[in-house]
Amino acid sequence: MITPPEPAHRFSHQAMGTFFEIAVADEDETYAGQAAQAVFREIDRIESLFSRFNPASEISRISRLKPGESLIIGIETFECLTAAEQVRQETHGAFDINVRALTKYLAPDNPHPPRNLVKGSESSENPRLPTNLLSLNKGSELASSPLKLVRTGSRFEALLTAQKDAAQGTLDLDLGGIGKGFALDKALALLADWSIENALIHAGTSTAVAIGSAPKAMGTKNSETHCTISEQIEVSPNSSLNSWGWPVGVGGGWPCPDAPRSVLLSGRALSGSGTEVKGHHILDPRTGNPAKGHIAAWASHSSAAIADALSTAFMVMDTQEVEAYCSRHSDLWALVVKDYGNCRVYGKVR
């Protein structure tokens, strides 16, 4: 028999350009607070590794590598870059952590025009960088990739290979589309180390991940937390939902009659992206042109990092591409909004 958890204790912390909030269902508020502070310290540590605004971060140092140089990196950077490359490959370049380099190349005042455009795309309307930015130490099949990740036992290394055709400034890595989700995954794992069995964590309400279930008190006035920004998720107490999990709103204000207005998260994550939050300047990394896929997208996956990256990719991909992707990944479901009143749900919502 499942015993409903005790009322949730809430804690918030600013990091990664947003506010992280933890709702912990634990009978001891002091213990829950200690666990939350441990999580926030871990998120701060991950930010120190990932932030492109910090010149000492591992991501900034990788972006400054010159051909032939390498950098010893931590397992977190290795894992996040590996996850980013996985999504890039699976979405055929719709998600790319090096898109900032492309943006700089397309700038009209760029004194160094691209010298490594993809063959067949040299027109000024459709320039782009090589899509095989990253090699995961798979040998000669990806030998042309400028950045290689190498793991030797417990040693992790990023290497920028020397390429005679590599353009200046090829690397300008930005983990903004996956880093917060990655931090949420690590946060949830740390809560498990503290034997916390019922918790929800969200990053600015754009990505959330949960374990266990919300307490009954989620339906009381004092415990309410709402967010109504369209492309963000809504952390919403809903006392009519009696199943196991944490009630989280989805779909924003878009009229989606065939889509759920809320889901129960437990053991998985939900992430949302959209033009109202990120603006109309989202580029399609495959073309360098403004994205024309969707105006809002949500993705739910067991990994918050993957959900975070996919919600960004689904903004770029067209509806048929999203449908095909979801059909190949049974652990995923997605909601995309093409235009007002035109919504599609793919995969089994859970």
Predicted region positions:
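Mature catalytic core of soluble alpha/beta enzymes
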Residues: M1-R350
